[in-house]
Amino acid sequence: MKSAEIREAFLRFFEEQGHTRVASSSLIPGNDPTLLFTNAGMNQFKDCFLGQEKRAYTRAVSSQKCVRAGGKHNDLENVGYTARHHTFFEMLGNFSFGDYFKRDAITYAWNFLTSEKWLNLPKEKLWVTVYASDDEAYDIWTKEVGVPAERMVRIGDNKGAPYASDNFWTMGDTGPCGPCTEIFYDHGADIWGGPPGSPEEDGDRYIEIWNNVFMQFNRTADGVLHPLPAPSVDTGMGLERISAVLQHVHSNYEIDLFQSLLAASAKAIGCTNDAQASLKVVADHIRSCGFLIADGVLPSNEGRGYVLRRIIRRACRHGNKLGAKGSFFYLIVAALVAEMGEAFPELKSQQAHIERVLKAEEEQFAKTLEQGLKILEQDLAELKGDVVPGDVVFKLYDTYGFPMDLTADIARERSLTIDEAGFEREMEAQRVRARSASSFGLDYNSLVKVDVDTEFTGYHATSGSAKVVALYKDGQSVDVLSEGQEGVVVLNQTPFYAESGGQVGDCGYLQAGNSRFDVRDTTKTGGAFLHHGVLASGSLIVGAPVETHVEADVRHATSLNHSATHLLHAALRKVLGDHVQQKGSLVDSQRLRFDFSHFEAIKPEQIKALEDIVNAEIRKNSAVETEETDIETAKQKGAMALFGEKYGDNVRVLSMGGDFSVELCGGIHANRTGDIGLLKIISEGGVASGVRRIEAVTGAAALAYLNAAEEQLKEAASLVKGSRDNLIDKLSAVLERNRALEKQLEQLQAKAAAAAGDDLSASAVDVKGVKVLAVRLDGQDGKALLALVDQLKNKLGRAVILLGSVHEEKVVLVAGVTKDLTGQLKAGDLMKQAAAAVGGKGGGRPDMAQGGGVDAGALDGALALTVPFVEQGL
């Protein structure tokens, strides 16, 4: 059976047993901030197992895409060198949430593996392990399924603590846990290795293919196990492993899925497909990279993006080792899509995006890869011992972009190790330097501790009545605020919007009789809304009734910009592709700022397309509609959620233009798109690797921006004695005239230089039979000095020349050496000394070099270096 057939058979088998087929979740965990990547089938069901989420089904089956690279579960260094380590793998799993338990789970597993209709594995080839004290599972296997006792193994606590066992699963030190039973396949006596639990269990003869976890206990802090009211089942079977068994091969890289990727990798690199470790690395890494990019991860220098960058660069290095010339990795994406795109449609829809991202990252790394490898080779040649020092590893990381594990990979090939502790010390020193260069203000939200839920009334109102429930000054709870004091007011209800989702908090004032508190900002901590400001008059006490007044004009302008960000987000996905995801935003009354995932600058024609699409939606004047619903219904309607935001059971869905823009959002918005009036993009640029930023203005601010641009056009037209209508023609004429004058100036400068050359040649001094000339000619640019040096070399014959000038407040230097002297004296060497003397850099060929600097006062001293340079070199 092919891998795709095995996957489909597994899903279909459990559907026939009443399970709901659930699509693989993203590789970016949406409900577990402790996880870097999804690494098991149960990740997306974690809240179901914890009883925190109820779904419409109690039985589920899935084929989950998983990544193990970075963090606690990191297989990266072993990938390519072993038969079964991968950065990406598929986990087939069936799950019961308080439905069936051990008997059914064991029976299902055995029937799927051994039934002629399904996998038809020989029963005598299967071994089973259970937790030592799990008599229930042991009896089911031996008495009901019929596995003989000689192929059953009880595994006890083999990891140094109670319930610390290969056959006892825990979610953490406390919480759901339980025994598990594992099924192993025996490859036969011709393969070395012993059964599970034996001293030889790490051999390749007995391979674990399926693990069934029985969550039946809750472990409390005192270590006591308490039975769960509704036990559950979590199982996992690696697709690659079971495929190897069914296809009668001993390495996962020999299965059909990898054979096509290995062939495509060899073709892209231009090498033979001979199962080298480096080729396996490339074939493995294209899977993790392709799926990570499809799920929205982009290469960067932190978090998930850095793990992706490490994997890409490791693949590039191994391709380079196999002889790849230029970019090759992105060429393998098509083979990945052909192999896995049917099961995972996101690969098909994102193919072009994946290829562009990989190619851009390859090209960026290529600029430093060769140079970094040379530096490493030099360091290894000088190495005494078998450990690469931490400072060398750090230098390669910091200067040439070599991730630590890439250097470790290269060291491993030489039977060397790296000093990881030394590398971490260098990294920490860099972090300390970064922290010392930064300053941070106090987070007053973190200082305010209040157990209050403020009711928000501001979706349809900007004023109302409320009661003061808490007051804070300098982060401390107080009973009263006096005139002139800054503080924080917490109310039982408020129309003030608290900063969230990129929208700034409302401002305004609170009135309590003759007392007035000016609200400058509103934030939120827990369920409490914090009104930050100053008491302008009177005094304010806890329990006082107040009238709330939001600055309506500011709120309205902010709401227009917020709605415009939603339209812009939708337009970006239409123009650039579905890979675009919001990475941050800032919306206030003056403008909007929107950060999003994209790997290259946006072209001018794309900027125009974005504006056209958004303004077309504005002109439609469609209603901005909101709906309260549950999260699953919202997702079914196509609502986009901001990754990293925690949503409750009920969410607010905001729609504009029908299905043009549908997002989860709790912010304040326009009533109709036409209220926005107009959107104008005023800037676009990069803010981090793989993240771009657009700034835009709307409504009155957009009109003011266009009016200012119109005034600039009029002023420019006036300067060239033209009008707006003929400004381009007038500017073209001025520029053409300017070019003609510059050409005339160059000709005059050349004549002046020729005349100066006749005069300067007489100033040369003789040093050991060589004419040496070092002269200062202020006002001359580098081009004029180059021409003059050429002329002087012809006039002087055997000569060394250094000319310097202060031009436009910068030092310009040109050095020349006649070719008969370049074996002993090099212009580039002279230039390095002279440029360093004026606080700059320089270099060039042996016969001609250029440089410059910023210290005009040191120019004469730099020129004086010429004679000693010649004397020492001859």
UniProtKB/Swiss-Prot annotation:
One of its GO terms (biological process) is negative regulation of DNA-templated transcription. PANTHER family: ALANINE--TRNA LIGASE, CYTOPLASMIC, ALANYL-TRNA SYNTHETASE. NCBIfam families: alaS (TIGR00344). Keywords: Aminoacyl-tRNA synthetase, ATP-binding, Cytoplasm, Ligase, Metal-binding, Nucleotide-binding, Protein biosynthesis, RNA-binding, tRNA-binding, Zinc. This is Alanine--tRNA ligase. Zn(2+) binds at residues 562, 566, 665, 669. InterPro entries: aa-tRNA-synth_II/BPL/LPL (IPR045864), Ala-tRNA-lgiase_IIc (IPR002318), Ala-tRNA-ligase_IIc_anticod-bd (IPR018162), Ala-tRNA-synth_IIc_core (IPR018165), Ala-tRNA-synth_IIc_N (IPR018164), Ala-tRNA_ligase (IPR050058), Ala_tRNA_ligase_euk/bac (IPR023033), DHHA1_dom (IPR003156). One of its GO terms (molecular function) is ATP binding. It catalyses: tRNA(Ala) + L-alanine + ATP = L-alanyl-tRNA(Ala) + AMP + diphosphate. It comes from Pseudomonas fluorescens (strain Pf0-1). Its EC number is 6.1.1.7. Catalyzes the attachment of alanine to tRNA(Ala) in a two-step reaction: alanine is first activated by ATP to form Ala-AMP and then transferred to the acceptor end of tRNA(Ala). Also edits incorrectly charged Ser-tRNA(Ala) and Gly-tRNA(Ala) via its editing domain. The keyword Aminoacyl-tRNA synthetase applies. It is an enzyme of class 6 (ligase). Binds 1 zinc ion per subunit. Consists of three domains; the N-terminal catalytic domain, the editing domain and the C-terminal C-Ala domain. The editing domain removes incorrectly charged amino acids, while the C-Ala domain, along with tRNA(Ala), serves as a bridge to cooperatively bring together the editing and aminoacylation centers thus stimulating deacylation of misacylated tRNAs.
